[in-house]
């Protein structure tokens, strides 16, 4: 791959993240310039995989994700040079579409940062399980089973971000990766709580059977918000569990490279904002506007991250 090809791919990934990631783009953009291109490339890889699982039928999604896995493995093995035009496509029907323009930037990120192929394998495993799930199926019996899924599609995001951001000292890698996985799993639980209604509409149920039974509701009852008191208690329970997990990761920013801590803290603060909205108005999980912090709060998060170093004084 030429520098021109990589640069064009990185530019495309940045613009894609700006349009698609929306509010989280602010947090990602706090990453220093020398690491930002890698972050956008990895984000775009993850978004492409997620879109394949979400937007294609199972018969289409599984081959697409398998092709993506093969290409990713080749990149990590150093056996993809990007010269074959056909190698830019996930499936023959995708050939030439702009959504595949992230591969040169992703390959450059893999070559430049200590990313691990197993993380991306894990994410694809999680997304494949989404693609084959039966509509309306309660997939997880207990929270322990959900925890594995949360690692695959949430914890892996934290691990990859840590590899891109780097740590303050070499001896901090182990703890930083452990906390990154935990934080990503907490973020994913907030995502699950926020998107219960939207997920139900496409036949997906992530709330464990044990939680539904504890509150005396079915997945269908939760999606229709009846009875409201039990449904609200369930949502608040999920959110409080996630917030408790986030508290346990308070040291994470202190382990990161100093110039990357602001980006990590801003993303955490954004998710805390989503959690607060859901605690105050849990019905937003199934109807009304998608739960997110107000615009003024997003601006304040970015300003605080840049000027106040809040992770040094707050847990």
PLM regions and their residue ranges:
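Catalytic cores of Mg2+-dependent Asp-rich isoprenoid enzymes
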Residues: 1-187, 193, 197-315
């Amino acid at each position: 791959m030429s520098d021109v090809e990589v640069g064009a791919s990185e530019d495309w990934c940045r613009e894609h993240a700006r349009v698609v990631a929306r509010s989280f783009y602010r947090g990602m953009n706090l990453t220093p310039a020398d690491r930002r291109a890698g972050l956008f490339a990895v984000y775009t890889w993850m978004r492409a995989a997620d879109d394949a699982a979400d937007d294609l039928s199972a018969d289409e999604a599984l081959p697409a994700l398998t092709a993506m896995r093969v290409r990713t493995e080749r990149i990590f093995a150093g056996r993809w040079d990007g010269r074959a035009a056909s190698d830019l496509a996930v499936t023959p029907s995708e050939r030439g579409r702009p959504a595949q323009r992230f591969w040169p930037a992703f390959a450059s990120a893999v070559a430049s940062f200590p990313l691990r192929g197993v993380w991306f394998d894990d994410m694809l495993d999680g997304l494949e399980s989404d693609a084959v799930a039966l509509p309306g199926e309660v997939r997880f019996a207990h929270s322990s089973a959900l925890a594995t899924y949360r690692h695959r599609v949430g914890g892996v995001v934290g691990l990859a971000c840590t590899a891109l951001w780097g740590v303050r000292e070499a001896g901090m890698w182990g703890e930083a990766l452990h906390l990154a996985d935990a934080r990503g799993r907490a973020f994913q639980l907030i995502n699950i709580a926020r998107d219960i209604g939207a997920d139900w509409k496409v036949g997906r149920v992530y709330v464990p059977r044990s939680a539904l039974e504890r509150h005396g509701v079915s997945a269908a009852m939760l999606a229709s918000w009846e009875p409201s008191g039990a449904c609200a208690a369930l949502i608040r329970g999920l959110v409080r569990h996630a917030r408790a997990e986030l508290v346990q990761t308070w040291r994470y920013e202190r382990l990161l490279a100093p110039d990357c801590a602001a980006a990590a803290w801003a993303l955490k603060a954004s998710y805390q904002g989503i959690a607060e909205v859901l605690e105050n108005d849990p019905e937003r999980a199934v109807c009304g506007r998608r739960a997110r912090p107000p615009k003024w709060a997003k601006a304040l998060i970015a300003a605080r991250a840049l000027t106040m170093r809040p992770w040094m004084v707050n847990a």
